[in-house]
Amino acid sequence: MDSSEVVKVKQASIPAPGSILSQPNTEQSPAIVLPFQFEATTFGTAETAAQVSLQTADPITKLTAPYRHAQIVECKAILTPTDLAVSNPLTVYLAWVPANSPATPTQILRVYGGQSFVLGGAISAAKTIEVPLNLDSVNRMLKDSVTYTDTPKLLAYSRAPTNPSKIPTASIQISGRIRLSKPMLIAN
């Protein structure tokens, strides 16, 4: 088995892109597109119920701090098992939703497109799973002159393992690229 194999899984979603303020018909500020990646949560030591809003996630707010506008260009959730997952498999539930969705991590399978993944065990132990964010189902604008309530949010859940590990057996990272524009005047 190739340990570098990546399984890419699309989430079914309803096309409902967010609306944003119209751009003025004048010269625009230059923009820069930067990559980002951060660990959203870990699994395997206890029950995990995570809700990660990209608009308020600490790594994203630090990256976007010196800019007035920030827009997601691409984004994905990456489920990564560790070597401990071979002997301690676990099921992880995952769904991308708009931030204003009332769904909770324990309701993922009742959300259209919510999925479950088995991490670990003899068959899928070394496979990384990528779940891309469908940008047509959320508002891409994380930072603007107004605050949007339908920006991307990741829901993730895993029950408490039968034999909890002292260190995590899997983790989930959120990775992507973000367009930043209109620098702010800030004190150094």
Swiss-Prot record:
Entry's localization field: Virion
Keyword Metal-binding applies: no
Signal peptide interval: none
Keywords per UniProt: Capsid protein, T=3 icosahedral capsid protein, Virion
Pfam families recorded: Tymo_coat
Presence of the UniProt keyword Mitochondrion in the record: no
Disulfide bonds: none
Molecular-function GO terms, alphabetical: structural molecule activity
GO cellular component terms attached to this protein's record: T=3 icosahedral viral capsid
Similarity comment: family membership: Belongs to the tymoviruses capsid protein family.
Function: Self-assembles to form a T=3 icosahedral capsid composed of 180 copies of the capsid protein. The capsid encapsulates the single-stranded RNA genome.
UniProt-recorded name of the protein: Capsid protein
Organism field: Physalis mottle virus (PhMV)
